[in-house]
Amino acid sequence: MIRAAGAVLWREGSVAVVHRPRYDDWSLPKGKLDPGETVPAAAVREVREETGFRAVLGRHLRRVSYEVAAGPKVVDYFSAWAASGAFSPNDEVDELRWVPFAEASDLVSRDTDRVVLEDFLAEPADLAHVLLVRHAKAGKRDNWPGDDDLRPLSAAGWRQAAGLRSLLPLWAPSRVHSAPRVRCVDTVRGVADDLGAAVLLEPRLSEEGYWPDREAALVRFLEIADGTGASVVSSQGGVIPDIVSTLADLGGLPLDGTPCKKGSAWLLAFRRPAPGWSTSDSSTGWPRLVAAHYLPTALPTP
């Protein structure tokens, strides 16, 4: 199976559509994964190579599958904001057009691209994003003689944390939050260090802080989601599935389950609420979860 990734690259009410002379078609930017590359990293790289723009990833749109001469091909598409850059013709793409949102489907050549664009247009382009991470591996509790709050990452856990340090910046987070346990903080400390920021401790998002006042914890999570830019939140396996499933239920978003492996992340996209929203308002006025995509690992798949 051929793995590939691409994006709906957008700015100011328009999306980028590229012309590929090899196929003489108009397409969304996409391409095959390089060896040792994750799907999100491939999406960002392919956008840069084909369009010249630095992409900041947003929500996962869909996975499409089709047959090519070399066999089945699977492409994951993300929404992506064009943060900076300029187009220059290159070996793969000889023309780029910025097309109004509503007109892009008329230009692309493939029906699969039209389906991806339909998904993109179903929600506002400018959504709020939270990357909800389960802490990396920290060995077995029974093998740690000290306070469990201080149980450190294992060697495998540090490798997972290094993968997250490379992966999570693709969404350009501006803040890093964590449950207070050492293994949660250390899982995302590298991301915070690269931002030159401190990890913001969130006691309500630990297992011992969440369940005694679940509603207050969910409200705190939504407050984080409503911040400027994307946020990273590191928490625990006893909390994350309930956060995701509860917010999905509130948003009317169907899910096929809420897996939560150590070192994994949920990419959550929220429709922004009206300014001045309050928890005293009806929950229909809160940030609304409109997309949830599970990233089972930050490490490249062999």
Q: Which positions does each model-derived feature cover?
A:
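NUDIX/MutT-family hydrolases
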Residues: 87-124, 295
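Active-site-adjacent beta-strand/loop module that shapes the phosphate/pyrophosphate-binding cleft
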Residues: 64-87
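Acidic, low-complexity terminal tails and accessory targeting/binding regions
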Residues: 159-175, 197-200, 207-229, 245-302
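Generic beta-sheet signal
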Residues: 130-131, 227-238
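N-terminal strand-loop-strand
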Residues: 1-28, 130-135
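A short coil-to-beta-strand element that immediately follows conserved catalytic motifs
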Residues: 54-63, 195-203
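Active-site-proximal alpha-helix that buttresses catalytic centers in soluble enzyme cores
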Residues: 31-33, 42, 126-212, 241, ...
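The catalytic Nudix box helix
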Residues: 28-60
